[in-house]
């Protein structure tokens, strides 16, 4: 009898694990239908997943020092240790940051892409590099519950996207080294600026002797080796510019075999959650992306946001599947609003939490209980009756502290914030 009960328990556990794994493959777009039937109406598990990864992307914005008066403009305010706790992530212990990522560019970009210290700020931490995100890995408990070890790459976006959107050129260049020609497509081309941020290096900068691409790929390789005996997944996420970098990063990992480990040669699935993403590449890039196995991308687009469509569709093509949301349907937000609110990531996540479909008659209901105050972190979007000040996410006293002599000095970062 005891043996029978033990076998029954083991069988039930195995069936539960299998069902959980199958469900995860479905919500990560890994099934043959790639989110078909899960987007309208939005599946409950997928809704929570989008918000989870969106919050990991939001952490990059929350930590960025953007004030050009600071010598540390363009750097992270916090060190990797306890990073998600410092940015007040909703589940700060679910992932552990293992590496910061830095980028530079060999071509001229809009100033908003990479904030840098003003000449009057004094000795700058770097004149060439910017902190561009991080790599993290799921904690033991989270991995055990999920049945897999999730590796996340979170790419930083820009705080002033509506300013750079109209200053963005439309130059396409071959995506050499990232993705090449294949069965059914010729050499893909991608946006020159996005590719430059992803692949540029500078031997004069200690932060970019390796490109952002090389830093991320090296860390993914290291983590896959560290967890070689576990089921793993790779999730890439970002908002705005970060979403464009996520798109490049995701196909790069799969096209060049960085998701294949050991003698088993079994590929690790790669999923990108791209929020408010501009288009990245041409029709050949689209063919390559949408034809590559073990690669899925979900674009989340707010209907009135101009950034996802700013690059002309005659030259640039959307990739992956699309989840369309509309912040104008929320009864909690000011209406009319403007481009800054429509593009803001917290407003996006609010829309994901409440969307009831893309149809004309679809309503809005916050089925995920996200704090309304988050909407006003960086913008003035929440209706006045909720009594939440606009753009309230600021460092106390803007980073000014009183030293031992009683004088006020700028101390807007913690020790170790320039870790690699």
Swiss-Prot record:
Keywords assigned: Coiled coil, Glycoprotein, Hydrolase, Lipid degradation, Lipid metabolism, Secreted, Signal
Active site: 240 (acyl-ester intermediate), 240 (charge relay system), 305 (charge relay system), 343 (charge relay system)
EC number per UniProt: 3.1.1.-
Hydrolase listed as a keyword: yes
Top-level enzyme category: hydrolase
GO CC annotations on file: extracellular region
Domain of life from the UniProt record: Eukaryota
Gene Ontology MF, one: phospholipase A1 activity
Glycosylated position list: 231, 294, 403
Signal sequence annotation: 1-21
Keyword Plastid: no
GO process terms (BP): lipid catabolic process
Subcellular location(s) per record: Secreted
PANTHER family documented for this protein: PHOSPHOLIPASE A1-II 3, PHOSPHOLIPASE A1-IIGAMMA
Protein function: Acylhydrolase that catalyzes the hydrolysis of phospholipids at the sn-1 position.
Family: Belongs to the AB hydrolase superfamily. Lipase family.
Protein name: Phospholipase A1-II 3
Species assigned in the record: Oryza sativa subsp. indica
Lineage of the species this protein comes from: Eukaryota, Viridiplantae, Streptophyta, Embryophyta, Tracheophyta
């Amino acid at each position: 009898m005891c043996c029978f009960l033990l076998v029954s328990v083991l069988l039930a556990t195995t069936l539960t694990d299998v069902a959980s794994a199958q469900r995860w493959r479905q919500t990560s777009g890994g099934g043959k239908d790639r989110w078909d039937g899960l987007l309208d109406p939005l599946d409950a598990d997928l809704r929570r997943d989008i918000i989870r990864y969106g919050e990991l992307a939001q952490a990059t914005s929350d930590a960025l020092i953007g004030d050009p008066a600071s010598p540390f403009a363009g750097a992270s305010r916090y060190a990797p240790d306890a990073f998600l706790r410092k940015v007040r992530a909703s589940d700060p212990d679910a992932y552990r940051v293992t590496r910061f990522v830095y980028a530079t560019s060999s071509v001229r970009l809009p100033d908003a892409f990479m904030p840098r210290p003003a000449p009057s700020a004094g000795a700058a931490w770097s004149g060439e590099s910017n902190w561009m995100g991080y790599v993290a890995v799921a904690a033991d408990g989270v991995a055990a519950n999920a049945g897999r070890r999730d590796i996340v790459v979170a790419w930083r976006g820009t705080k002033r996207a509506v300013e750079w959107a109209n200053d963005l050129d439309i130059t396409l260049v071959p995506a050499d080294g990232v993705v090449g020609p294949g069965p059914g497509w010729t050499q893909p081309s991608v946006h020159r600026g996005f590719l430059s941020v992803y692949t540029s290096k500078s031997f004069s900068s200690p932060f970019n002797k390796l490109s952002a691409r090389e830093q991320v790929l090296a860390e993914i390789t290291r983590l896959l080796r560290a967890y070689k005996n576990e089921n793993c997944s790779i999730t890439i996420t970002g908002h705005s510019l970060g979403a464009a970098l996520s798109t490049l990063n995701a196909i790069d990992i799969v096209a060049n075999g960085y998701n294949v480990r050991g003698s088993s040669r079994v590929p690790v699935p790669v999923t990108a959650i791209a929020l408010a993403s501009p288009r990245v590449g041409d029709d050949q890039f689209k063919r390559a992306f949408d034809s590559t196995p073990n690669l899925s991308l979900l674009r989340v687009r707010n209907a009135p946001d101009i950034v996802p469509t700013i690059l002309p569709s005659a030259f640039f093509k959307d990739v992956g599947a699309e989840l369309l949301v509309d912040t104008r349907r929320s009864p909690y937000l000011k209406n009319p609003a403007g481009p800054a609110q429509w593009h803001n990531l917290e407003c996006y996540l609010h829309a994901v939490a409440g969307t009831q479909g893309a149809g004309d008659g679809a309503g809005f209901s916050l089925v995920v209980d996200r704090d309304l105050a988050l909407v006003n972190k960086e913008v003035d979007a929440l209706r006045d009756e909720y009594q939440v000040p606009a753009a309230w996410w600021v460092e106390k006293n803007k980073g000014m502290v009183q030293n031992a002599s009683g004088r006020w000095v700028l101390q807007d970062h913690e020790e170790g914030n320039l870790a690699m």
